[in-house]
UniProtKB/Swiss-Prot annotation:
This is Resolvase OPG149. Keywords: DNA damage, DNA recombination, DNA repair, Hydrolase, Lipoprotein, Magnesium, Nuclease, Palmitate, Phosphoprotein. SUPFAM superfamilies: Ribonuclease H-like. One of its GO terms (biological process) is DNA repair. It is an enzyme of class 3 (hydrolase). Coiled coil: none annotated. The gene is OPG149. Belongs to the RuvC family. Poxviruses-type subfamily. It comes from Variola virus (isolate Human/India/Ind3/1967). One of its GO terms (molecular function) is nuclease activity. It comes from the Viruses. It holds the Pfam family Pox_A22.
Length: 187
């Protein structure tokens, strides 16, 4: 598991009162067996702090590994990339929802992928480019390992950042939404 160090960045210019927004720990998972990824962000006051960005491995003994990955932080919100109905990874979504159901007040939300349109390869390329842009903003670019397969990490990070920006009603040009605003769906 590779992890980036934490850093914080203020993303909005208009102040928000504590009544409007308190500290929140957001976790986003890009689901998969061999290449799942997790991003954990802390949103407090007017800033976002990257707590963790990790590549995970759920290829064997996945129940224990997912439980361990879920137990590392006290999440307020867990975002899961929506999977097609017959995907073999749907079991991960149901396991995570079940694991968190009675143990915490964590909201578990299934969301559509951030990048849409064009080809699969183009979407992954745009996701990695947006991820690198954010790493520059957070001052973490040097912490990103040099590797070819960064799209899973990028996807999990972009899921989390889109959620934060949408809560703050802030636009970011890299995140092209579908025509409908129904990309968040509770399962």
């Amino acid at each position: 598991m590779e992890t980036l160090t934490s850093s914080s960045q203020s993303l909005i210019s208009s102040p928000m009162s504590k009544k409007d927004y308190s500290s929140e720990i957001i976790c986003a998972f890009d689901i998969g067996a061999k290449n799942p990824a997790r991003t954990v962000l802390e949103v407090k006051d007017n800033s976002v702090r990257v707590l963790d960005i990790s590549k995970l491995d759920w290829s064997s003994d996945w129940e224990r590994r997912i439980a361990k990955d879920l137990s590392q932080y006290e999440y307020t919100t867990v975002l899961l990339e929506r999977q097609p109905r017959r995907s073999p990874y749907v079991k991960f979504i149901y396991f995570i929802k079940g694991f968190l159901y009675h143990t915490s007040a964590t909201k578990v939300i299934c969301v559509s992928p951030v990048m849409s349109g064009n080809s699969y390869r183009d979407r992954k390329k745009r996701s990695v480019e947006a991820f690198f842009d954010w790493m520059d903003i957070f001052g973490l670019r040097d912490s990103v390992p040099d590797r070819r397969k960064l799209d899973d990490v990028a996807d999990s990070f972009n899921l989390a950042m889109r959620y934060v920006l949408d809560k703050w009603n802030t636009n970011y040009t890299h995140y092209n939404r579908c025509k409908s605003r129904n990309y968040i769906k509770k399962m």
